[in-house]
Amino acid sequence: MSELPDLSQIAPTLKAEILAEALPYIRQYHGKTVVIKYGGNAMTEERLKQGFARDVILLKLVGINPVIVHGGGPQIDQALKKIGKQGTFIQGMRVTDEETMEVVEWVLGGEVQQDIVTLINHFGGHAVGLTGKDGGLIHARKMLMPDRDNPGQYVDIGQVGEVEAINPAVVKALQDDAFIPVISPIGFGEDGLSYNINADLVAGKLAVVLNAEKLVMMTNIPGVMDKEGNLLTDLSAREIDGLFADGTISGGMLPKISSALDAAKSGVRSVHIIDGRIEHSVLLEILTEQPFGTMIRSH
């Protein structure tokens, strides 16, 4: 895995060059919102967790408004295992019965979210955690999963939702008060139920509603890969349709790429899928010229 060098070991002139390279990007994104889908190894390895917290604080300090939407699949799996329950997935979505939903709410809205918030605040930032149920943020509806074996039929995957609507007022209020919002992807339905929503889908929809300048999705691979394992650095809507059709994009990448493409088509100017295993990957993507990950284009 590639890593950034320790800044303490870099010559002063090179440090200056790095800062100078970042300047035009700081100007470009100053005052703008950047939505970051945070997940994968970056959420579990201590070095990466600390690096991410510092990176988010730096973005805020230079006038960029980061909004974090986090996942937590591995943590949910561990919690389910403790109660003797195994996670099941259909087309990249977690089957969520009532018992699983209780675990999801506790893990995402409690353990995982508070870990992120605490770390950011520990390093001097000002983060506030909330779920989609707070402030009426995410209105959800039950997801109807098409049955691929029976056209026209649907598979019941429980309390799995999709975004019906987003009310960004609470997020904007936090941004106005210089806080960093950290959002757990749990929505509420008109039926009074809580819904587990894929974090990629929430991040994409939120980026559109907030008129974000950029959407960054962190994952455990370099980006979107072809069948030979080569990184695809730039993908158009037509190319993505082809990758869906031939099965190159499958499993957990399905909702990620679908959400990224929808965001690009809906006006988010820059959409990237990046390797969260690389330290400071968010800063590399936002504040440098270095080509990184996969760019998703709407045309």
Curated annotation (Swiss-Prot):
The keyword Acetylation does not apply. The record marks K37, K256 as: Transition state stabilizer. It is found in: Cytoplasm. Its main location: cytoplasm. One of its GO terms (biological process) is arginine biosynthetic process via ornithine. Coiled coil: none annotated. It comes from Paraburkholderia xenovorans (strain LB400). It catalyses: N-acetyl-L-glutamate + ATP = N-acetyl-L-glutamyl 5-phosphate + ADP. This is Acetylglutamate kinase.
